[in-house]
Regions:
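Extracytoplasmic/secreted envelope proteins and their assembly/folding machinery
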Residues: 22, 26-30, 87-90, 118, ...
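Extracytoplasmic/periplasmic helical hairpin
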Residues: 2-31, 147-149
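Conserved beta-strands of PAS-like sensory domains
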Residues: 110-149, 167
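Conserved beta-strand and immediately adjacent loop positions that scaffold enzyme active sites
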Residues: 41, 115-118, 155, 162
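Extracellular/periplasmic ligand-sensing ectodomains of membrane signal-transduction proteins
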Residues: 12, 16-19, 32-99, 104-112, ...
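Residues that line or immediately flank small-molecule/substrate-binding pockets and catalytic motifs
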Residues: 46, 136, 160
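Intrinsic low-complexity, intrinsically disordered coil/linker regions enriched in small/polar
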Residues: 139-175
């Protein structure tokens, strides 16, 4: 678990404080992504019950080689919590109360097959504050798996938590 403490100045509304806090941490979030091989997207998003629906940081590359560009974050007010396709990256880790790897998927906006790692953030009293996450070009991981050798003729492969194959040079994904 990741715990974060917000020390809100007296008189500042919580929704306004999220925006002020974002200004303070935005560069650190971007630097973290800029120093992570294969990072395509990085985000810090706040619980929409306590913040503006587009508050936080969202930065994305248009290709693996391009610069991160800050964009307007997803508007939470446009989606129901059960809409896994659009906001599952936020609600699934919060509900699990632990960091999770999302299943690999094709991001149609940038045409990159990617995997997401998302960490929920909680206050000391257990209240959900938000999430911090990163989407990574899945080929960065599969290339590492392909380069791994086991003894002289063995090789590595990648499975998910249920044992389904995510990457194997001789077997189709999902078997």
């Amino acid at each position: 678990r990741v715990w974060i403490v917000f020390l809100r100045p007296l008189g500042l509304r919580l929704k306004d404080y999220a925006d002020t806090y974002t200004e303070t941490v935005q560069q650190a979030v971007l630097d973290f992504a800029n120093h992570t091989n294969g990072a395509v997207t990085v985000y810090l998003r706040y619980n929409p019950n306590y913040s503006n629906p587009t508050s936080g940081v969202f930065a994305q590359r248009q290709s693996v080689d391009s610069e991160l560009q800050c964009l307007t974050p997803t508007d939470f007010s446009m989606y129901d919590e059960s809409d896994v396709e659009h906001v599952g990256w936020y609600y699934l880790p919060v509900q699990a109360k632990e960091a999770i790897w999302m299943s690999p998927y094709m991001n149609e906006n940038v045409n990159i097959y990617m995997i997401s790692y998302v960490v929920p953030l909680f206050a000391e009293d257990g209240t959900s504050i938000g999430v911090v996450g990163m989407d990574i070009d899945f080929s960065q991981i599969t290339d590492l798996v392909d380069e791994t050798t086991v003894y002289q003729s063995g090789y590595a492969f990648l499975t998910d938590a249920s044992g389904s194959i995510m990457h194997h040079k001789n077997v189709d994904e999902g078997t």
